[in-house]
């Protein structure tokens, strides 16, 4: 299982009567989202996740908490009965997934963002028009917030942990409220951020990962 990872895009609903005004709308939306994310230093809240495997026809739901301190600290902890956790402490990324890989914890370089991005929205907000092909998605209401939908597909040559992503951005504060990613394995991962708190104080202890007793460390930080 990969981490909560995924993010933002830009599109327009173009109709003949609207002409050029419609074509300009997505630029404003993405710029507002980029500007809003630039002001975020910390992020914390709760999430719900649904993972669907099209090959097996199964799905699983889970929930948990996340804490992020940009640029390189992240803690994602799943709620009981799961004990899975993904912790980026600023130096390495610890991936502990006993629900799918029992008895081990993987230690990855903090620079390895291919499978475990450590920036909740940076994957989408870093030059999105350059990196992704964009199309519109249906808007929806997320926890009482009107949210615009966008689809992005990585352009040829762009490395990304997904083949397609759909995101919903709050029309009021331009923050991501919900997103869905299609992974190369065929898994579809839907994330609903049930609460979002921006720039609140965070305890650095949240980014500590005490290694569980008896687990094997798979060290991928060495060549």
Residue spans of the language-model regions?
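Bacterial N-terminal signal peptides that target proteins for export
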Residues: 1-11
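N-terminal leader/targeting segments and the immediate start of mature chains
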Residues: 11, 19-61, 73, 211-223
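Extracytoplasmic/secreted envelope proteins and their assembly/folding machinery
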Residues: 27-37, 90, 118-121, 166, ...
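Extracytoplasmic
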Residues: 40-42, 61-63, 69-71, 81, ...
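A generic structural motif
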Residues: 48-54, 77-79, 96-98, 153-155, ...
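An acidic-aromatic
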Residues: 65-117, 189-192
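Flexible, surface-exposed loop/linker segments and immediately adjacent secondary-structure boundaries
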Residues: 101-146
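Gly/Pro-enriched, hydrophobic low-complexity segments
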Residues: 130-214, 219
């Amino acid at each position: 299982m990969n981490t909560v990872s995924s993010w933002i895009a830009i599109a327009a609903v173009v109709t003949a009567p609207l002409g050029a005004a419609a074509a300009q709308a997505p630029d404003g939306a993405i710029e507002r989202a980029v500007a809003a994310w630039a002001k975020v230093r910390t992020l914390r809240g709760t999430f719900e996740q649904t993972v669907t495997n099209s090959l097996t026809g199964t799905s699983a739901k889970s929930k948990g908490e996340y804490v992020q301190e940009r640029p390189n600290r992240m803690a994602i902890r799943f709620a009981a009965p799961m004990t899975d956790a993904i912790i980026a402490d600023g130096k390495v990324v610890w991936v502990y997934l006993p629900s799918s890989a029992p008895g081990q914890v993987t230690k990855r370089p903090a620079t390895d963002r291919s499978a475990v991005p450590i920036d909740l929205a940076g994957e989408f907000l870093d030059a999105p028009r350059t990196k992704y092909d964009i199309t519109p998605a249906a808007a929806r209401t997320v926890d009482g917030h009107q949210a615009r939908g966008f689809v992005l597909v990585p352009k040829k040559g762009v490395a990304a942990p997904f083949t397609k992503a759909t995101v919903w951005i709050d029309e009021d504060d331009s923050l991501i409220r919900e997103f869905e990613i299609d992974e190369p394995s065929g898994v579809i991962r839907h994330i609903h951020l049930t609460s979002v708190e921006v720039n609140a104080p965070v305890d650095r202890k949240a980014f500590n990962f005490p290694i569980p007793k008896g687990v094997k460390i798979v060290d991928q930080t060495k060549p």
